[in-house]
Amino acid sequence: MQAINLTDHFLIAMPRLEDSFFAKTLTYICEHNEQGALGLVVNRSTDLSVEKLLTQLGMSPQDPALSNLPVLLGGPVQVDNGFVLHEPVGAWRFTLSSNVVTGLTASIDILQAVADCQGPEKILVALGYSGWAAGQLEQELAQNAWLTVPAQSRILFELSFEERLPAAMKLLGIDFFNLSNEVGHA
């Protein structure tokens, strides 16, 4: 069996996915290799804005638009840690490149740059991440827990978090409400 690589793809939770955290989620896969996968849920927000988060970290945000940018709940792993998905990749400490333009950074330097209006052009800030051990995601895919589709920057950075799941579904020509819990074969 040939290994799959879902880096820079969306995972769309199927209705039958029994894990309540991932129900009706859209997850962006930042890295997927033989050791496992790492991603961020990109359609579930917290009650915290990026402006409030930066202020809580002792920073003085300069951009008023940050008060309208929600912090996302990226996943159930390390929910006390922040992760910034951004374009362009840039030269931040602790950055993982998902593709030539999109990076995931888990260091304070990028947050300080965002507060000072010197950060990347496009950002999503999340608390926590989603992780899969080696072979775990492949097993979940075989159980029809997820649909996959190549990610689009437009969906990540130009749409509100509520619009992201339906937009990703539309890439597949599917309406989420038409999905069934039942698996069948033709």
Swiss-Prot record:
Which cysteine pairs make disulfide bonds? Answer: none
Q: One matching Pfam family, short form?
A: DUF179
Q: Which GO terms describe its cellular component?
A: cytosol
Q: Read off the InterPro entries from this record.
A: AlgH-like (IPR003774)
Q: Could you tell me which SUPFAM superfamilies the record lists for this protein? A: VC0467-like
Q: Family membership, please give it.
A: Belongs to the UPF0301 (AlgH) family.
What's the protein here called? UPF0301 protein Neut_0448
Specify the species. Answer: Nitrosomonas eutropha (strain DSM 101675 / C91 / Nm57)
